[in-house]
UniProtKB/Swiss-Prot annotation:
Transmembrane segments: none annotated. Exoribonuclease involved in ribosome biosynthesis. Involved in the processing of ITS1, the internal transcribed spacer localized between the 18S and 5.8S rRNAs. This is RNA exonuclease 4. Its EC number is 3.1.-.-. Residues 1-75, 295-319 are annotated as: Disordered. The lineage of its organism: Eukaryota, Fungi, Dikarya, Ascomycota, Pezizomycotina. GO terms for biological process: ribosomal large subunit assembly; rRNA processing. The keyword rRNA processing applies. It is found in: Nucleus. Its main location: nucleus. Pfam families: RNase_T. Keywords: Exonuclease, Hydrolase, Nuclease, Nucleus, rRNA processing. The keyword Nucleus applies.
């Protein structure tokens, strides 16, 4: 029995030696020549790059805690994720187009909270890239006998995201007979640092060029500024057909629209033209698709209809 055990051990050792000396018969898996490894799409590479840029931007933001100035991305597109905003910037996509595409910033009324950062009578805000849409609102004072006629005393403009672009008190050219302070919020004291009408008018004219103007009953604001704007580039919340039901078919007030559609109380006391412009822009943004349809119907290009018009039929030759 001991001899058998000894022989078995010798056999095992011999088998191990033989297996070690022989080359492996296993074939390595071949990579098929017809199916080379696919390259990652450039979009993925760009997106990865964007994420890295976003992370580095976030890291630098943490290091700069307490800084006074916010980034351009934060100013122009609140609610946009950093990586998405960076991607838009790299690909020359405007912040407002990005917000419109992803419905960012218009899901709630957070735009109205920006009032805490408003700079009264600041003039033109620097460092903001102004997009396609702007909203305007003006405050008037009374001139003439009894103060029944109106003259411009303040004008405010915000962008698509409710960010203040312009705000200025304006010196009326006529003598003010009624400051209407309880409504306008303007007093004689406000005029100490007011700008001349011509200066304000020139600034507003530049801002309006090539842009879509949003406002409430814009006819009065444009008349006060002695400016005009193409009808196709105007979006007026007072004339929008979808809002007329809130005033029994007539022009609804901005205060009623803000209350009914936004759940926001404005004009409770002294008016703020910045707040009113912001509320108007928010109303437009929340109902933009309906505004677009209404505008398309109103300014649809006229196309010649076939067949039945005079002069289209060939003349018959006389025999």
């Amino acid at each position: 029995m001991a001899a058998l055990s000894s022989n078995w051990k010798k056999l095992q050792a011999k088998l191990k030696e033989e297996s070690a000396s022989k080359p492996s018969l296993k074939r390595k898996p071949e990579t098929p020549a017809t199916n080379p490894p696919t390259k990652k799409p450039k979009v993925q590479k760009s997106f990865t790059k964007t994420l890295k840029a976003a992370k580095s931007a976030q890291t630098s933001d943490k290091k700069k805690m307490g800084g006074v100035h916010s980034s351009k991305i934060e100013e122009t597109a609140p609610g946009t994720s950093t990586s998405l905003a960076l991607w838009a910037e790299d690909h020359d996509v405007s912040a407002e187009a990005l917000a419109e595409a992803y419905n960012l910033g218009a899901k709630d009324n957070s735009m109205m909270l920006a009032a805490a950062k408003d700079k009264i009578n600041h003039g033109l805000t620097e460092g903001i890239e102004i997009g396609k849409y702007i909203a305007i609102d003006c405050e008037m004072v009374g001139v003439g006998p009894g103060g029944h006629e109106s003259a411009l005393a303040r004008v405010s403009i915000v962008d698509f995201h409710g960010v203040q672009i312009y705000d200025s008190y304006v010196k009326p050219k006529e003598k003010v007979t009624n400051w209407r302070t309880a409504v306008s919020g303007i007093s004689q004291k406000s005029m100490r640092f007011a700008r001349d009408f011509e200066e304000v008018q020139a600034e507003i004219d530049k801002l309006l060029r090539g842009r879509i103007l949003v406002g409430h009953d814009l006819k009065h604001d444009l008349e006060a500024l002695i400016l005009s704007h193409p009808g196709k580039d105007i979006r007026d919340t007072a004339k929008f057909s979808g809002f007329k039901k809130y005033a029994n078919g007539r022009k609804p007030s901005l205060r009623v629209l803000a209350q009914q559609l936004l759940g926001v109380e404005i004009q409770g006391g002294e008016h703020s033209s910045i707040e009113d412009a912001r509320a108007t822009m928010l109303l437009f943004r929340k109902h933009k698709s309906a505004f677009d349809v209404d505008h398309a119907n109103r300014y649809a290009p006229k196309t010649a209809s076939g067949g039945g018009q005079k002069g289209n039929k060939p003349k018959k030759k006389k025999k």
